[in-house]
Amino acid sequence: MRSGTALRAAARNCHRPRRSHVPRRRRPGPVPASTGRSDKIDETAEQFTRDGAHVIPVRADLADADGVETVWQAVEKTGRPLAAAVLNAGRSIGGAFLDTGLDDELSLISLNVTSVVHLAKRVTRHMAEHGEGKILITSSLSATLPTPYETVYGPSRAFTRMFALGLREELKEHGVTVTCLMPGATDSDFHARAGMNNTAFGTGAKKNSRKVVARQGFVAMMEGRAEIVGGDAATKRSAIEHRFLPETYKAARHATKAKPRPHR
């Protein structure tokens, strides 16, 4: 990967980047990093700086079109070609569809789907113009099954998966690779922020290491792979299993894990 700018756009509950994932001889220039409206963006920038990286923190609401443009303007201000982009923004909402708020779900779609398309439009045109680049788009293992009690989240991740794979085919002739990362349940605050602590995905549940998942995604992006399931061997087996199981069976099984438990 040539020396240039790298972009990481993520919601604040997603995996934090680790500079150690970038080989020293290939480390890019400035890294505009957005983690939504959270003050964790400053912590992320400090972590990168301690490792000798030049990070430009950008606080922006990626569920809003103006927020996406703010991030892209930060990329343009570097004055350097964009070498790599990680589109990692996303969140879930737990609970029965009858009980969840419509505004919350429309906001989820804006973040998980609309912002990815919006930012990808800017990123892909820029990279195609320069004739090279690498893109990592985060989907989820949830893209491979119906997700009752996360009824809007799963379909949003199915979209990003197919979007990434479609883009990959289009951009081949322009020297740009697109990789889709599909993590299983990961040890971040993702499920807590989705209001799912009173489910099988809550506190104490066995989950994949976010450091391992981040490294797997980075390596796959650098190798130009089409997609990778992020997580341990059991997670990867689940992805294979999902290809053959009936959708109704997968839906029922997910419901037993994601359905809120009665308060005792």
List each language-model region with its residue ranges:
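Conserved NAD(P)H cofactor-binding loop of Rossmann-fold oxidoreductase domains
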Residues: 88-93
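Residue(s) in the substrate-gating loop at a strand-loop-helix junction
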Residues: 140
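Substrate-binding pocket helix/loop in short-chain dehydrogenase/reductase
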Residues: 96-98, 104-109
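Canonical Rossmann dinucleotide-binding motif of NAD(H)/NADP(H)-dependent dehydrogenases/reductases
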Residues: 1-32
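Rossmann-fold cofactor-recognition segment
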Residues: 48-66
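SDR active-site lid
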Residues: 168-233, 237, 243
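Active-site helix of classical SDR
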Residues: 120, 156
